[in-house]
């Protein structure tokens, strides 16, 4: 088990398990998975293909909501991506999941929560699909406003707190994990971004953990047609 930071909280030291959905499509699953990998937190992965057979019952055996992701930590069940990240930050305070500086940490939590709660137009119009060839989609006014706000967040965080590295707050943090699926969406749908945003996206995409997730996603056999927008005009990569 990586780390022993939970000793004072009475947490068990059984191996953590992270229940996730398809790596090609499940943006919510990607967030804690990526954070745990980058932070060096050991865990077992339980992947349940979404919309495949009796997937809901399979998820309910782990998660009370019937949704992914869900972190199993001994007798604890922690669901919702942001709640999982907060739990991990408490469990492993030495792993840098949030910035050490108080002002940066408050900002990181704010933008992570905004990502968790908002940007519904981008979610609907540009579903995460790593196997989709790069091809643009026309943005609705709502989606364009979402994109503008994301770019403003990235710019502000980088300008104010990003001097120590290529990520939003310098070093990789939970905030970057929350925005990583947006990076994939902007790449997949060829969303126009400025030079600074492009550099940030490249930094996220260069992470070994990101590359490992994407490589696994491209090998998955499952297809969720609702996420295959412009199908069959834009054919999924095999």
Map each language-model feature to its residues.
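GST-like domain detector, emphasizing the conserved glutathione-binding G-site
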Residues: 8-140
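A short, structure-level motif marking secondary-structure boundaries and short turns
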Residues: 16-19, 70, 168, 185-186, ...
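Conserved beta-strand edge residues that scaffold enzyme active sites
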Residues: 50-52, 200, 218
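Acidic/histidine-enriched, glycine/proline-rich intrinsically disordered or flexible terminal extensions
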Residues: 217-238
């Amino acid at each position: 088990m990586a780390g022993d930071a939970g000793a004072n909280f009475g947490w068990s030291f059984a191996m953590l398990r992270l229940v996730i959905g398809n790596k090609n499509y499940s943006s919510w699953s990607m967030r804690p998975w990526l954070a745990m990998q980058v932070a060096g937190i050991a865990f077992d992965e339980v992947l349940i293909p979404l919309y495949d057979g009796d997937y809901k019952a399979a998820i309910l055996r782990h998660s009370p909501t019937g949704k992914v992701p869900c972190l199993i930590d001994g007798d604890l069940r922690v669901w919702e991506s942001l709640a999982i990240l907060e739990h991990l930050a408490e469990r492993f305070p030495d792993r840098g999941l949030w910035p050490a500086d108080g002002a940066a940490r408050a900002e990181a939590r704010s933008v992570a929560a905004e990502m968790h709660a908002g940007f519904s137009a981008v979610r609907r119009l540009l579903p995460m699909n790593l196997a989709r060839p790069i091809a643009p989609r026309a943005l609705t006014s709502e989606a364009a406003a979402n994109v503008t706000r994301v770019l403003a967040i990235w710019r502000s965080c980088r300008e104010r707190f990003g001097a120590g590295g290529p990520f939003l707050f310098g070093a990789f943090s939970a905030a970057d994990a929350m925005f990583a699926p947006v990076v994939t969406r902007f790449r997949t749908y060829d969303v126009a971004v400025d030079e600074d945003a492009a550099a940030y996206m490249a930094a996220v995409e260069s992470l070994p953990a990101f590359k490992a997730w994407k490589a696994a996603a491209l090998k998955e056999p499952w297809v969720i047609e609702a996420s295959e927008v412009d199908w069959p005009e834009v054919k999924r990569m095999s």
